[in-house]
């Protein structure tokens, strides 16, 4: 059993294994685990778990059994119960054969095999289990995902249901719409079919219209050609009609000439019959308007009050009641005639006054000066009115704003009416009742203050005082004398303190030294012998010649503003009680105060105690002050910085008076203005500074007993008389200081009284005495700008570096005041410029703070005293050069002398001078500071701000450009061939501006700057006026009026590197320019080489549009002729158009050739044929057309006959085809046909304004381009060209219109236009000039003489010969038809020579010299260089003109033949003044008042004789030749042109009379009429007796008799300015007169043929 059991054991163990393996294999074969369902998987899992449990049991059993077998084998414990084990043991222990196999398998091996198999199976099962678990997990995950997906599915299902419902609704709507659209589609399809049908119809119609349009175009071109032909025919007819019209006009002028001759004969006959009755009435009329004159023999009874030039407003009725010399009683209400109302009868009646136009005579004071005349109802005598007729002319003072001057009676003109004593208007009986009771003291005072009649004044002029009435004392009644004196004092006081009744002062009138030095409202320095001072004791009389009393001048008064009510003006002639008017200082301008005191009645006259005259006291009523205290009241100058001559001038005349109260307070200084206004009468009378008189502030009486106080007062007032008397006293402390520390020297220096300062310094006053604030007299004078006082104090060793308590030095105070003279004096004295105040300010700070450029220049540039005179000009020029040129330190300019430490010095707040200038916007000062090389613009103040941070916009721009590169921008037009076709004066390059390139500038900014600069330049040169590039607001158009713009640019060169607008480099523009050392930016314009005309436009200044139009005409018509006056650039235009066409054709692939031929008088038709044939322009008919383009230019066609030269080619040129051949006859008798092909272009140039004669037949076969001088492009070409030249000369800057260069260019333009206009009016179109000759005008800044010299050369070389040739050729047409023009030109007649010279003289003065910018003296030097200027212009200017305005008297003026004048007394003439006469000559004169019957009669007779003589001359000339008469008419019509300037409207003063060289020895004049010598006497105003003598001598001379010419000028009237049978009416200032006398023996011809002579009917 054991054996069986043993043997069966393996089978048993093997069976399950095999079964399991078979099952596994079957399972693998039959099914797949992955395909099992869930239930099958569960079942499989349970089976596998059961199998695992069974295996575990088997394993345990086998382990137990193995243990038993092991024990048996090991320890011999055998179990005999098992026979199989025994058999096995026997078998194994048997034979001992090792190779015997056991009978049965070892259980251990079986167990191991089973165990190994089990392990494998376990691993496999564990693997399958892990896979099953992972699948289970995945399954769980999938379950969760499935649940989420199901939820989502449910949601989506719900949504889909909703969407479905919505879509269903939409679908229903879409279905409806589809149905509707389907219906519409059907309708649209039907419509489309209809439209397509219509479109086909329209296409057919369009094609038909296109055919018709092409046919219409062909017809239009044909019609245009016909129109061109018709226009040419019209031009021809117009020329023919114009010639006919000229003939008719010539006939008409002949008839008019006959009519005028008849009229003149009738007028002469009438004048011969009516001469006697016609002379009496004007005499009465004239006398009615004349104010009586005072001859030298008249007595002093004619009364003149206060001044000699009072305004007299009087009607004819008033004056008619007065005889010639009227003794007027002293009544205050009657109208009075001033003592010096003599008008032009006086020898020197014109007082030199800058800026006043003819206000030297009384004509404009009496009825001819509306701005200065009160209403006629105010018949009054102006107390301190404007002086208009002082006797001696004095040099005018620079103060152009001072009030009018007043002339004193003591300086009346010599040998004429002597001035009567002046009395108060408020004392009618003063003159009649004063002589009883005069004591010797009064007589002595009278003798002293009246002065000697022949004492020379300070200017050396001896003045005559009138013969005073002998007021010898007849009674010694002192009581009566005292009472009369008191009354007189009171009334004089009330008079001088009453409101002034005077006309408003004329602006620009300056006070003069003598003959009118008394200021209008400052004081009345009048000699009043009839008003005596009251005897207050027995001191000795003042000797008349005491030193220091009358020989010391007092300063003139600056302008004062009189505060008065206009309603009181009419009461100025009578006694008027006016209330006190004390204006506070705040209501008046600085330095002007006027206080009109109250007039006190006679009952309040003070009882003056007898005291010495020098002991001044004021009574309680305050009515009288001693004459010594008030004899001289100095003027305190207005504190105006930069005055050329402040009030410390020494040019004023001193005329001490007995009682001279100041009618208004003198201008006070700023310090006195601050203290308040004083109402004291003493202040009103003397002008005493209120700051020195605190007791007078209340208006009550102030004792003045103290001598030091009197010294202060005299020094403050500038009272030299009182001051000298006080200084002569012993024991007087001249260094006494008042409470504020002001010494007398300080007060005198502060108020600018140079004479007082000199007296005090000579007396030993301390020159460096300081006041409480530490200011010395030098500080006070420098602070007020009194440079005379400063110079005097410096000469007395004043401390120039003295610093006040706050550290202000005199230099600092002068800079603060802006006084250039004081600064210069201090700098020359060697003052220290670096002294600082307590606030840290230097003089540079002070100068910059006031914005005074001149002061800053002096501080920075003033070096040595040697350059004192020329310093300012050099500095200003150098500074301007620096700024304009943009260079930091150009060679030759002065360098600043101040160190950089002073310029960069900072004050207490850290501000430098640059901070101050930048913050206040003082750009000029900042520029001067920036020119200093050591300026630190980045320096910061204590708030860390630079000058740029606090600067205004302008100053910021200046500071930003401080370190910028200034690169000139130039425009280049390429190479211009030298001498090519009139382009000699064209420039290749022109500088248009300077580009400021800063470090932060980008390429976009640079591109915009270049474009803007080009646009501005093109706009500027094509504008009408001188406008700055910055000031002009140009429109947004890219092209200018000449058609140029940024599109005209071909390329731009940055140095030598090409660049295009918008291009950017890696470097910035600033770095690029620095690295490449680019010194300029050049803009190249497109030219003919590119097929463009932009460069031609810029070179010639012809608008681009017109050049393109010319090019179109050439390409369209093939035959074009350019014609115009000589010098109209015809050749240049033709050549440039040919070049442009050539390059265009070459760009299109054609070959092109330009053939140029110059036509002269010998150019024959055969030569032209050879030219046409050789250039292949004229080809045989048999030959086919060539593709080569030929451009033929025929120049100077005016030198040949067009009809002879081109007559046979007209038809072939117009119709270029084989159908219009031209037959050429060869020399051998054969002929050949040629024709012009379409590729040939013919251009011609003619230097002639218009065609004449047979040449008109050629006109209709060519396209003519007329270049008129008065139309574009020639009209504005010269202006644009010269403006571009000026811009180039000024390095791109446009100068201001007032710059001399602009005036010179404008003058050249005016010369060209006026010259052509006059030549056109003269009927000589062949003499017209184009602008070419004027293109070479030199533009030299500051040297207008070069331009005038160039003009003289042009006139002599070109203009004058052309004019002479044209006039001679015209005169020769009628006179010498058989001899020809050449003979007439070689041998002109005397009449022709005279006409030529007259024409040249008129053209020279009318068109050339008129408006010349040179000063008068320089123009006189250059005038002789002009040929033809020696003809006397009075010949053509001695004819009359008519005016609508009547009412002028015969005024006496002199006429100069000069074209221009610059006189100090008269304003320059206006040639085109709108209010002047349209016809003839209108002479401006001042009406004459002081002439009597005899004078007027003599004038009329001499006038008639002169005019009859000119008429005879006129007839003699006209009888000689009719052709010359025509030219004469042209000359006179040219003179009387409305549109042109008038030759007679030239300078009208004797000093400005022009005398041309060669006028004395002129054969043309001496041979025509040798019987007329002209007196070489100078024309001068005549007195009455001289006029009478002249009239008596002249009345004996008959008409036409040879006699000596009268030296009286011919008076002219606006009504008839011809033979001077004039209508006499009221005077006017709008007339001028003809100068007859030229100081040469010349003949006076009257060229005016058609004058109408009127006889006087009044």
UniProtKB/Swiss-Prot annotation:
Residues 120-276 form a coiled coil. ANK repeats lie at residues 706-736, 740-769, 773-802, 806-835, 839-868, 909-939. The modification Phosphoserine is found at residue 1521. SUPFAM superfamilies: Ankyrin repeat. Gene3D superfamilies: Ankyrin repeat-containing domain (1.25.40.20). GO terms for cellular component: cell cortex; dendritic spine; FAR/SIN/STRIPAK complex; glutamatergic synapse. It is found in: Cytoplasm, Cell cortex; Cell projection, Dendritic spine. This is Cortactin-binding protein 2. It comes from Felis catus. The gene is CTTNBP2.
């Amino acid at each position: 059993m054991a054996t069986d059991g043993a043997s069966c054991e393996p089978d048993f163990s093997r069976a399950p294994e095999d079964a399991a393996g078979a099952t596994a294999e079957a399972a693998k074969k039959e099914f797949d685990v992955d395909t099992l369902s869930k239930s099958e998987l569960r079942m499989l899992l349970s089976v596998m778990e059961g199998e695992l449990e069974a295996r575990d049991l088997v394993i345990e059993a086998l382990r137990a059994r193995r243990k038993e077998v092991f024990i048996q084998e090991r320890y011999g414990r055998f179990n005999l119960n098992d026979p199989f084990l025994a058999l096995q043991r026997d078998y194994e222990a048997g034979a001992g054969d090792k190779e015997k196999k056991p009978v049965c398998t070892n259980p251990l091996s079986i167990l191991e095999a089973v165990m190994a198999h089990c392990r494998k199976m376990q691993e496999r099962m564990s693997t399958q289990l892990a896979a099953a678990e992972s699948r289970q997990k995945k399954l769980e995950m999938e379950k969760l995902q499935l649940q989420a997906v199901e939820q989502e599915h449910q949601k989506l299902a719900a949504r889909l249901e909703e969407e479905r419902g919505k879509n269903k609704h939409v679908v229903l709507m879409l279905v409806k719409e589809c149905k509707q659209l389907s219906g519409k589609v059907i309708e649209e399809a039907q419509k489309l079919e209809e439209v397509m049908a219509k479109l086909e119809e329209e296409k057919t119609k369009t094609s038909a219209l296109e055919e018709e349009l092409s046919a219409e175009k062909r017809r239009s071109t044909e019609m245009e050609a016909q129109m061109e032909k018709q226009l040419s025919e019209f031009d021809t007819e117009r020329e023919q009609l114009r010639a006919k019209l000229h003939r008719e006009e010539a006939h008409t002028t002949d008839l008019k000439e006959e009519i005028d001759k008849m009229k003149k004969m009738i007028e002469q006959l009438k004048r011969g019959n009516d001469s006697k009755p016609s002379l009496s009435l004007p005499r009465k009329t004239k006398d009615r308007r004349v104010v009586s004159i005072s001859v030298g023999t008249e007595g002093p009874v004619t009364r003149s009050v206060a001044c000699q030039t009072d305004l007299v407003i009087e009607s004819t009725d008033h004056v008619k009641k007065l005889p010639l010399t009227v003794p007027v009683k002293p009544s205050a209400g009657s109208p009075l005639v001033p003592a010096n109302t003599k008008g032009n009868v006086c020898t020197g009646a014109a007082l030199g006054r800058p800026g006043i136009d003819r206000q030297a005579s009384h004509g404009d004071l009496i009825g001819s000066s509306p701005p200065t005349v009160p209403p006629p109802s105010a018949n009054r005598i102006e107390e301190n009115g404007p002086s208009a007729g002082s006797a001696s002319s004095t040099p005018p003072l620079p103060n152009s704003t001072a009030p009018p001057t007043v002339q004193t009676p003591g300086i009346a003109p010599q040998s004429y009416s002597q001035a009567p004593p002046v009395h108060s208007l408020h004392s009618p009986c003063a003159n009649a009742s004063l002589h009883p009771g005069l004591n010797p003291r009064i007589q002595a005072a009278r003798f002293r203050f009246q002065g000697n009649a022949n004492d020379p004044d300070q200017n050396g002029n001896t003045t005559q005082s009138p013969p005073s009435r002998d007021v010898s004392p007849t009674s010694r009644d002192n009581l009566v004398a005292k009472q009369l004196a008191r009354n007189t004092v009171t009334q004089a006081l009330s008079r001088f303190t009453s409101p002034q009744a005077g006309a408003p002062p004329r602006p620009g009138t300056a006070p003069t030294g003598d003959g009118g030095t008394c200021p209008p409202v400052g004081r009345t320095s009048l000699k009043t012998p009839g008003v005596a001072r009251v005897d207050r004791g027995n001191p000795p009389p003042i000797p008349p010649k005491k030193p220091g009393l009358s020989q010391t001048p007092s300063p003139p008064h600056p302008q004062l503003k009189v505060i008065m009510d206009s309603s009181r003006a009419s009461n100025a002639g009578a006694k008027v009680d006016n209330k006190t008017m004390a204006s506070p200082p705040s209501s008046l301008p600085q330095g002007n105060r006027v206080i009109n005191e109250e007039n006190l009645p006679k009952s309040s006259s003070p009882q003056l105690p007898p005291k010495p005259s020098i002991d001044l006291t004021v009574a309680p009523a305050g009515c009288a002050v001693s004459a010594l205290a008030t004899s001289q009241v100095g003027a305190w100058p207005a504190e105006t910085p930069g005055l050329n001559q402040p009030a410390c001038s020494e040019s004023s005349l001193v005329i001490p008076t007995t009682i001279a109260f100041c009618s208004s307070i003198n201008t006070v200084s700023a310090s006195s203005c601050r203290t308040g206004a004083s109402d004291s009468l003493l202040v009103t009378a003397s002008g005493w500074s209120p700051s020195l008189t605190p007791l007078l502030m209340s208006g009550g009486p102030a004792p003045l007993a103290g001598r030091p106080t009197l010294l202060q007062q005299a020094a403050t007032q500038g009272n030299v008389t009182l001051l000298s008397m006080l200084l002569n006293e012993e024991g007087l402390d001249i260094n006494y200081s008042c409470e504020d520390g002001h010494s007398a020297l300080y007060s005198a220096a502060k108020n600018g009284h140079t004479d007082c300062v000199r007296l005090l310094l000579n007396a030993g006053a301390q020159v460096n005495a300081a006041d409480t604030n530490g200011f010395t007299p030098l500080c006070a004078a420098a602070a007020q700008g009194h440079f005379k006082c400063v110079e005097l104090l410096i000469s007395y060793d004043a401390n120039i570096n003295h610093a006040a308590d706050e550290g202000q030095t005199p230099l600092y105070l002068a800079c603060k005041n802006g006084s250039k003279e004081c600064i210069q004096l201090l700098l020359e004295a060697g003052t220290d410029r670096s002294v600082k105040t307590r606030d840290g300010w230097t003089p540079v700070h002070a100068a910059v703070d006031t914005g005074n450029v001149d002061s800053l220049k002096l501080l920075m540039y003033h070096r040595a005293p040697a350059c004192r005179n020329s310093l300012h000009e050099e500095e200003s020029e150098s500074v301007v050069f620096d700024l304009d040129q943009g260079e930091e330190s150009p060679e030759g300019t002065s360098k600043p002398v101040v160190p950089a430490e002073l310029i960069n010095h900072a004050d207490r707040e850290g501000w430098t001078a640059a901070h101050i200038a930048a913050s206040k916007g003082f750009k000029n000062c900042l520029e001067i500071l920036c020119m200093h090389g050591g300026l630190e613009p980045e320096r910061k103040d204590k708030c860390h701000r630079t000058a740029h941070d606090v600067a205004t916009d302008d100053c910021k721009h200046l500071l930003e450009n401080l370190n910028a590169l200034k690169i000139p921008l130039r425009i280049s037009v390429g190479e211009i061939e030298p001498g090519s076709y009139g382009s000699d004066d064209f420039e290749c390059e022109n500088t248009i501006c300077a580009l400021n390139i800063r470090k932060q500038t980008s390429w976009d900014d640079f591109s915009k700057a270049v474009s803007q600069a080009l646009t501005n330049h093109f706009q500027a040169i094509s504008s009408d006026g001188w406008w700055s590039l910055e000031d002009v607001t140009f429109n947004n158009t890219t092209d200018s009026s000449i058609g140029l713009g940024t599109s005209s640019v071909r390329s731009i060169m940055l140095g030598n590197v090409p660049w295009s607008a918008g291009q950017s480099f890696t470097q910035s523009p600033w770095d690029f320019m620095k690295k490449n050392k680019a010194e300029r930016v050049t803009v190249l314009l497109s030219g003919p080489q590119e097929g463009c005309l932009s460069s031609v436009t810029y070179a010639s200044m012809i608008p681009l549009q017109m050049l393109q139009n010319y090019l179109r005409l050439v390409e369209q018509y093939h035959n074009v002729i350019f014609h115009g006056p000589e010098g109209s650039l015809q050749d240049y235009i033709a050549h440039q158009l040919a070049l442009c066409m050539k390059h265009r054709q070459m760009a299109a692939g054609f070959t092109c050739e330009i053939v140029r031929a110059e036509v002269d008088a010998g150019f024959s038709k055969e030569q032209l044929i050879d030219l046409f044939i050789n250039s292949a322009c004229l080809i045989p008919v048999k030959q086919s057309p060539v593709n080569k383009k030929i451009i033929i230019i025929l120049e100077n066609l005016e030198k040949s006959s067009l009809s002879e030269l081109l007559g046979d080619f007209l038809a072939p040129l117009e119709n270029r085809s084989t159908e219009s051949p031209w037959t050429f006859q060869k020399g051998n008798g054969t002929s050949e046909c040629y024709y012009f092909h379409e590729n040939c272009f013919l251009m011609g140039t003619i230097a002639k304004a218009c065609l004449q004669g047979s040449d008109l037949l050629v006109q209709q076969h060519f396209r003519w381009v007329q270049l008129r001088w008065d139309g574009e492009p020639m009209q504005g070409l010269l202006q644009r060209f010269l403006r571009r030249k000026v811009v180039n000369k000024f390095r791109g800057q446009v100068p201001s219109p007032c710059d001399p260069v602009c005036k010179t260019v404008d003058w050249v333009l005016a010369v060209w236009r006026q010259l052509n206009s006059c030549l056109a009016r003269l009927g000589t179109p062949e003499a017209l000039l184009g602008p070419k000759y004027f293109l070479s005008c030199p533009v030299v800044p500051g040297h207008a003489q070069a331009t005038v010299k160039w003009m003289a050369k042009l006139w002599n070389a070109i203009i004058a010969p052309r004019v002479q040739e044209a006039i001679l050729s015209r005169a020769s047409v009628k006179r010498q038809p058989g001899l020809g023009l050449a003979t007439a030109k070689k041998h002109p007649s005397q009449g022709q020579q005279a006409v030529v010279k007259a024409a040249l003289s008129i053209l020279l003065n009318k068109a050339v010299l008129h408006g010349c910018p040179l000063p008068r003296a320089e123009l006189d030097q250059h005038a002789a260089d002009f040929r033809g200027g020696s003809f006397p212009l009075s010949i053509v200017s001695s004819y009359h003109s008519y005016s609508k305005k009547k009412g002028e008297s015969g005024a006496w003026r002199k006429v100069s033949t000069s074209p221009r004048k610059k006189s100090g007394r008269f304003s320059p003439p206006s040639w085109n003044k709108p209010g002047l006469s349209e016809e003839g000559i209108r002479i401006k004169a001042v009406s004459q008042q002081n002439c009597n019957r005899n004078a007027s009669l003599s004038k009329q007779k001499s006038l008639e004789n002169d005019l009859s003589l000119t008429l005879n001359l006129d007839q003699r000339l006209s009888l000689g030749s009719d052709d010359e008469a025509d030219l004469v008419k042209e000359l006179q019509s040219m003179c009387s042109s409305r549109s042109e300037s008038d030759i007679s409207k030239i300078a009208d003063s004797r000093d400005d009379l022009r005398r041309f060289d060669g006028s004395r020895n002129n054969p043309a004049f001496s041979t025509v009429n040798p019987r007329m010598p002209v007196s070489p006497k100078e024309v001068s105003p005549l007195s009455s007796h001289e006029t009478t003598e002249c009239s008596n001598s002249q009345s004996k001379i008959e008409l036409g008799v040879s006699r000596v010419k009268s030296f009286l000028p011919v008076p002219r009237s606006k009504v008839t300015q011809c033979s001077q049978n004039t209508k006499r009416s009221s005077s006017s200032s709008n007339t001028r007169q003809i100068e007859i006398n030229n100081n040469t023996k010349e003949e006076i011809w009257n060229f005016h043929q058609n004058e109408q002579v009127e006889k006087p009917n009044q």
